[in-house]
Amino acid sequence: MADKTVKELADMVSKTASAVQQQLVDAGLPARAEGDLVTELEQEKLVTYLKQSHGQEEKRRISLKSKTTSTARVTGSSGKSKSVNVEVRKKKVFEKPDPEKMAEELAAREQAMIESQARAAKDAEDRAATKKKSEERQAATLAAMRASLGSSKKSDDKNDDISTSVVVKKGGKTTIEVKPKEQPKKKVAATKPKVETAVERKAREVREKEEARLREIETETRRTQAEEAQKRTLEQMRKMAGQYTDQPATEVRKDEPLAEGLVGDALEESFEKERREIKRGTSSTTARGRGRRKNQDEREIKNRKNGLRSSQSAQHKFEKPVEKIVYDVEISEQITVSDLAQRMAVKAREVTKLLMKMGEIARESDTIDQATASLIVEEMGHNPVPVSDTKVEDDLQDAADERSSNVQTRPPVVTIMGHVDHGKTSLLDKIRETKVATGEAGGITQHIGAYHVKTARGVITFLDTPGHAAFSAMRSRGAQATDIVVLVVAADDGMMPQTEEAIDHARAAGTPLIVAINKMDKPSADPDRVLNELTAKEVVSEEWGGDTPMARISAKTGDGIDELLELISLQAELMELEAPLDGPAQGVVIESRLEKGRGPVVSVLVKKGTLKQGDLVLAGEHYGKVRAMTDEHGQRIQSAGPSIPVEILGLPETPAAGSEFLVLTDEKKAREVADFRTNRERERQLERQNAMRLESMFDQMEQGNVSYLNIVLKTDVRGSLEALLSALNELSTDEVKVRVISSGVGPISESDVTLAESSEAVLLGFNVRADATARRKSDTANMDIRYYSVIYGLIDDVKAAMSGMLAPEHREKILGVADVREVFRSSKFGAAAGCMVVEGTIYRNKPIRVLRNDQVIFTGQLQSLRRYKEDVNEVRTGMECGLAVRGYDVEAGDKIEVFEIQEFARTI
């Protein structure tokens, strides 16, 4: 879900904005105004709060079950072996912890950590104090020794050469060493017996005491290590024994050593022995194996003599992989099951099986959300990497913005909007001194036209938008890509539906609005009425104290056009429009079409940078190099700056109108982004297809008989295609639905005719024609191809075709009423009624109803109708008659009502 305002959330849940604001406050979120945005995280928190408030608990436990089957050979009592299927079932439960319990555990862990740190600090202080006392004691001993050495009378030159050193060892242990100084070697005849002095004796005693203390500490340390090794060995044995029991042992991390203590030493010794045997070549027991090993050793010796190193020594030829390959799986917000399986290098059915165990039924082409996909990836032993759908495009846009520089003033982009036939194109023709309106089919604009005009006040770029109701998307794109909106209103016609829609588009885009009241040259012009109607839509003129500039003009005579251009230039100066001139070009696709001999032709409006011939352009889902560039007059140009519309050639397909384009330098990056957008669009289409399939299923359950009008549609440009598709979808009713089998841009081809023939569809062309092959195919198949140049005609013909598919409407018409005055018996008909016709005409062969006390009690046919004993076919008002009702006995006072059912054709 995207970020939404409080007002949008209220509209989604059909509640008032104040109620949604109160719910946000109850959920613990800060108070928001109606126009403030609510982030996705806050929306999820609000939904969680509402679920809990309605008594719905969050699902905290997910159980996963797996089953593996293997075959084992077992020897029976008779000595024969047989195969036995061994089935191992495992169950794994993922339980989401309770937030309260998590908070308690976290607090307990923090308290334990604080206590541990306090104990560690206290131990460190005790060790420091002990070390200090030991050093002081050793220093005192050394001082006493030095004092005794100075006062000794038996000191001689040999004793003076004694050097005393204090060595402080690690752990606070201090030893005193007494060493004689080195003397030059002299030749002596005989060695005199060495006499131990008092200082040497004292030093020896201190050294012996210290060595004894060290031996005690070492003995204690060895004993402690032996006990710890024994504990680790027992624990390791318990873990190894647990693998052969039904209950799984405690999980051990992959990075822990295989074994410790006695077991680890034994395993290590075994591995070392195997490595030594491999090196010596004694691991092969058979003669054949010994022969191969001998030959291999001879080759190794020969290679060593030649200065080569054998790559086969001290290792096996083949090592079976013992660890599973773990992938880092990138998961977007929506991903299909097949794509997820491909990224994990497994088959799609493995993922679907795991989904079924989790309670999700999904096919390979179905999409799953990011959370479910992450759980699947973790269960299969891989690392999920959540990726945002817009990360690639955001990085691309950031890189493009960093390369932009040299900001300069750019021309304004002005969009002309208004109701159909209010003079928008005529106004542009007068400004450009052209005659575009006279060449438009039906006299109305059906495409977005882009022009840049050099006026006395500078260059201005104009966008001409259609005014027909079907082109709402085009007008919305025009308002988004523009700087200023000029709203054209006819002075003799006033506000119309598309005029109000244009005002809404301008407000939604936050674009300044300038009103041009056109057709002031007509006698029926009433500008005050237009001002009143605009004020009702909160568009107040500056003349009436508002902030909307208005100009009274005449596109026919040219009056007021200079004033309008002056208002546009003034508004552009106030906006201070700027754009970087250097760097890669960025902009928006205005329109795209497919021309024979030229290929895809794309009309673009440059917003930043400079577009040059040869640039690599990425537009929507397609990319390619610009082979040629032309302006609106068809003249070849080499470059186009900001706010300049151009037509480019070189893209492989026609991009969607309204999509943004960007110039890149790296073709690999362009291909990556294009593939990403293509995959995203494919996922969206799959979602729409699933939704349509579900919707059609419900429709078939609710409605037993629905007719479909199949259509194959081809248009000249993408904008017209979007407008027609939207208009045709709006024509669908509960009884007749429009189904567009295929649509595209370009001329009608043979494949279109074949598709229309196989699907029994109507083939329609809007401003395009069929090629020679398609015409021959249509003649052979006796298929009619309809061509249109005005959108009115196409929509009207589709409505007529849908009306012909509607079931006729049945209506009852009362033809006559007769009162039963008397009932008598007839030997031929039984009960017969004498009646007076009080209204209309009574017909013998029409259905009748018998009314008693103004309630229908019988519906059937007349068996006989007579007047004066003669059989007649009808009796008019004011005449008496006798009649007999087939299968029913009437009574005096009843009314006989004659009616007929008429059929009426229905229309859309």
Curated annotation (Swiss-Prot):
Gene name of the record: infB
Species this chain originates from: Psychrobacter arcticus (strain DSM 17307 / VKM B-2377 / 273-4)
Principal subcellular localization: cytoplasm
Cross-referenced Pfam families: EF-G_D2 (PF22042), GTP_EFTU (PF00009), IF-2 (PF11987), IF2_assoc (PF08364), IF2_N (PF04760)
Disulfide bond annotation, renumbered to this chain: none
Xref: PANTHER family: TR-TYPE G DOMAIN-CONTAINING PROTEIN (PTHR43381:SF5), TRANSLATION INITIATION FACTOR IF-2-RELATED (PTHR43381)
Protein name: Translation initiation factor IF-2
Keyword terms of this UniProt record: Cytoplasm, GTP-binding, Initiation factor, Nucleotide-binding, Protein biosynthesis
Cellular component terms (Gene Ontology): cytosol
Region (G4): 518-521
Region (Disordered): 52-229, 241-316
GO MF term (any one): GTP binding
tr-type G domain span: 409-578
Binding sites annotated in the UniProt record for GTP: 418-425, 464-468, 518-521
Family (UniProt): Belongs to the TRAFAC class translation factor GTPase superfamily. Classic translation factor GTPase family. IF-2 subfamily.
Subcellular location: Cytoplasm
G2: annotated segments: 443-447
Entry keyword Nucleotide-binding: yes
Stretch list, region G1: 418-425
Region (G3): 464-467
PROSITE patterns: G_TR_2, IF2
